[in-house]
Amino acid sequence: MKYETRITRITVGPEGKEIYAPEVTHVEIDDEAAGEFLVLRQNRDDKDSEQTIRIDSDEWPEIVKAVEQLRKGMR
């Protein structure tokens, strides 16, 4: 059997912040036996729960376009 190494989680946050801080976002590849999808997770201030957004790979390009369109209009 041949093995591989995959990166399936990247953590993005302010420099020096703990990985459980509410400002930190975890971007992950997940799979529940129906194909892989992206998950964005953030811990809430109460530290006992998290917020999760699940995104299908086909949906991602349109979400990126929408985010960029709105970001360009920010003041």
List PLM regions with ranges.
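Positively charged, low-complexity terminal tracts
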Residues: 1-75
